[in-house]
Each structure stands twice: as C-alpha cells, then as structure tokens.
Amino acid sequence: MAAKDVKFGNDARIKMLRGVNILADAVKVTLGPKGRNVVLDKSFGSPTITKDGVSVAREIELEDKFENMGAQMVKEVASKANDAAGDGTTTATVLAQSIITEGLKAVAAGMNPMDLKRGIDKAVIAAVEELKKLSVPCSDSKAIAQVGTISANSDSTVGELIAQAMEKVGKEGVITVEEGSGLQDELDVVEGMQFDRGYLSPYFINKPETGSIELESPFILLADKKISNIREMLPVLEAVAKAGKPLLIIAEDVEGEALATLVVNTMRGIVKVAAVKAPGFGDRRKAMLQDIATLTAGTVISEEIGLELEKTTLEDLGQAKRVVINKDTTIIIDGVGDEAAIQGRVAQIRQQIEDATSDYDKEKLQERVAKLAGGVAVIKVGAATEVEMKEKKARVEDALHATRAAVEEGVVAGGGVALIRAAHAIAGLKGDNEDQNVGIKVALRAMESPLRQIVVNAGEEASVIANKVKAGEGSFGYNAYTEEYGDMIAMGILDPTKVTRSALQYAASIAGLMITTECMVTDLPRDDKGADMGAGGMGGMGGMGGMM
C-alpha cells in the first residue's frame, strides 16, 4: 500500500479552498448574458469553445492532490445540478464558492463547523420554501420561449424553436437535438406513434414516388408471435377484404409462405396489406405492442393469454386514421383508442419511470410516454463550423432541460433576483445559538453572489447594483443584457424554479461537507528514481544507486 500524505485543520482547508477557487473562477466567467467563453483544449481535434458551466468544470483536473480534492467536490455540485435540472450549473458553482469561502472564514475565526452547517441548512430549507411561494406557473408558449432564450445565452431563435416544439408535441413529448446539415436551425415534428421498423417487403409499396406505403383508415393486427403459416391468417384476411379496408400487420416476424401470399394478394389488389416487425425485443416488445394496442383500441394476439390467430375477428383489430411506412420507420397517426385508456397507460408507464433504476430504462420509458402522449420533435441545429455546431448543440440541450424544468415547477424572476428576494424574506431567521446564526448569515450572503457575478461579467459595479436591487421588491431587478432596471418577469428574464432550487440545495450540501472537513488524506507522490537503480533481489542494498 502506498504511503499517504495527511493534512489537518487549517492547512487542509487552505489547500482545499485554493482548488475550489481555481475551478469556480474558471466556471463563473460564463455566467449571465454577458458571460465570457472558455476554450477547452482537446487531445485530438480542434479546441472546444463553451459557455456551459458543467462542460468547463468537467475538464478541470489539478496537479496538487489536495487542491484537486477541493476542485472535484465543487465539480460534483455542477454535475448534480446538471443531472437534476439540466441547467443552473454555473449558479450552483458560484453559490458553493461563496458559502465555502465565507464558511471557512468563520471556522478560522473559531466558530463550530457543525453549527455553521446546521445554520446553512436551516437557511436553505427556508429559502427553498420562499422560492416555491415566488414561483409562477409556466404554461404559455411565450414564457417557455423566454426561459429557453435565457438558458441558451439570450439566443431568441433557440427559445422560439423549443416553444414551437413543445406546442406541437405537448409538454410530455420527446424533443431531441441533432446536428443539422445547413446553416439554419430546423424543427421536424413527427406526429403520432413512430417506431423504428420498416416494411418487410418492398412489394407492399403503394407510393413509388416517395418509396413509402400509405394506408388510409386501416385495420391493425397485433401479434406477439412469428407468422409463417398463411392458414392462420385466412379468417382475418377474408373479414378485412369484406370490410374493404387496408390491413397493417405488426408481428414478431412474418416470413415464408405467409409473407409471399400477402405480397401476391396486395399486388393483385384483392386486399391491401402491409407487414412490419414489432418494435423492441423481449419484454420491451410485449410492452410496446400493448402500447400500440391501447393507442389503436386493438388487442395483442398472444398465445400466452390464450388468443389464437385463426379465431381473430375484426373486433380484435386496432384502427387508426392513417399509417405511413418507409424502409426504416412506421408512423401510426390518430389511433382510435379511448383517451381515458391511453391516459391510464401513460400513468402506468410514469410509475415505472419512478421505479426504474437505470438511466437507459428511464429514457426508453420516457420515449414510450411521449409516443402515446403526443409525438416526437427533432430540433436540427445549424452552424457554419463544427466548433460552433458543438457549442450551439450544447446550448440548445441546456435550454431544452431548462424549459422542461420550468414547465414542471414554474418560473421565478431571473438574473439572481429570486434568491435575493428569498434571502430578504428569511432575514429574520434565527438559529439555536450564535454559531448557527453565523451559518444563516453565510447562506444569506451567498444568495447575493449569482446577481453580483452576472453584474461583474457585464463590466458593472456589483455592490451598487446589488444594493439597488435589494431596495426594490417583487421581480424588480437588473437586466445585464440591456443594462437597465425593471420588472424581470415583464422583460422575459425568467429562471425555472427547479433550476434555482436545485442549484441552492446542491451548493449548500457540498459546501456544508467541505466546511466540516478537518482532515484530508491522499497518496504521496511516488519517487521511483532511487529504487530503479538499486540491485533487484538484495534486500538492504536498494540505495546502491546513490553510490554511483
């Protein structure tokens, strides 16, 4: 086991604070509408230019191991805020730096670290309650666009795109961000249920100009089995032919004689059929077939529950207004499923999302909710160069997370104003003893730091503006972009409540741990020079290298 380097008390805290400051100073230059860029060197390819706090934090690794521990703990603040709300990483870092700096000063002055931490925690709990009171719902497109714009560093086109996407696919819909091929940002919306399975035979194509199959008001047969024997299918095919409607078959697979017969029937015009494989694999396929059944008011024909293909009637088939199939995807538009049944299914999947442990499962379940609830929107980001593309894509993703958070918990006045109002509302809070009171003051002072940093980055005098904002009330604040005072909500400067709340909670959590640190342990750097020159197996002669 390697020898350890151990530092105690003030020595440890000074080193840790130095690491905190290096990381926080690098991150906080990006805060606000006039925040600066940070250039990150990459071991291959061109450097990355970013204004995203968490991207900067992730790149920082310090040589001094004690300093690095401080930096890594603050990096954790940014990561946690990012995971919880997808934004607010820079705000969280600025808050953490302020609480740690002020807290360690108090520890150096002889305060009890545990009481300081209790005071900080008390203040944060009270401030979070105040933020909830200040929060207003974010329901209309205008507010959503404003939140997106602020999070994308005042890029209004991004805010508008996100608002349009949310309008099209609903608040629950899946919105993905991809790299586009042109200079302009684009929005593609896929309405209805789409899954990644195309036609099983090109002979089903009835729209040769687009290479796709379009079925109007089709019946939909859902089978959780391979279909290879056409005899099983005959009763259904005859019933569908009599009804004079097309048929879409979604099954584990359709092969051999069954597929050949379906193709021949389609080409002769006896019955219009298309067949696709069911989406997903294993249990996920069963669940997705059930989703489609709910959406189209059909029944999944599965031998597990005693249903056989030969006995299938038109009542067992689902229906939709339209189905479009190409070689890779199938889209079911306007299924006739009962709205209450669809909502019930969505609620059931939501419960599974809460119980899911892996991110992959959560993502897949979220996709299923979106497909049932509305549709999928794809924002294609346009840019002139690859470097700009990466930077912009990261900003759009941030903005998307922020708007989701805003829809979830509402919005508060942006520009650091909400924290100042929350701090003012709890200014009379008292702890159990004097040290806790100091902890409360540390937290209250830290809540001013985001506003101060936004102002500093805009090249203005922080104290003057902070005092003027503190003297105001409600959503009165300072717009660093236009350099004027006014009602932040009216000016469209909004922050999602969830983002502000998460930033404060995670910053206080990690800062509290760091203030109460008394000892730090790390590996001593290994000095291999002397050992290498020693005589291998001769126990006490390891130092012979020095005699040369």
UniProtKB/Swiss-Prot annotation:
It catalyses: ATP + H2O + a folded polypeptide = ADP + phosphate + an unfolded polypeptide. It comes from the Bacteria. Pfam families: Cpn60_TCP1. InterPro entries: Chaperonin_Cpn60_CS, Cpn60/GroEL, Cpn60/GroEL/TCP-1, GroEL-like_apical_dom_sf, GROEL-like_equatorial_sf, TCP-1-like_intermed_sf. This is Chaperonin GroEL. Together with its co-chaperonin GroES, plays an essential role in assisting protein folding. The GroEL-GroES system forms a nano-cage that allows encapsulation of the non-native substrate proteins and provides a physical environment optimized to promote and accelerate protein folding. It is found in: Cytoplasm. SUPFAM superfamilies: GroEL apical domain-like, GroEL equatorial domain-like, GroEL-intermediate domain like. ATP binds at residues 30-33, 51, 87-91, 415, 495. Belongs to the chaperonin (HSP60) family. GO terms for cellular component: GroEL-GroES complex. It comes from Yersinia pestis. Keywords: ATP-binding, Chaperone, Cytoplasm, Isomerase, Nucleotide-binding. GO terms for molecular function: ATP binding; ATP-dependent protein folding chaperone; isomerase activity; unfolded protein binding. Signal peptide: none annotated. Its EC number is 5.6.1.7. One of its GO terms (biological process) is chaperone cofactor-dependent protein refolding. Forms a cylinder of 14 subunits composed of two heptameric rings stacked back-to-back. Interacts with the co-chaperonin GroES.
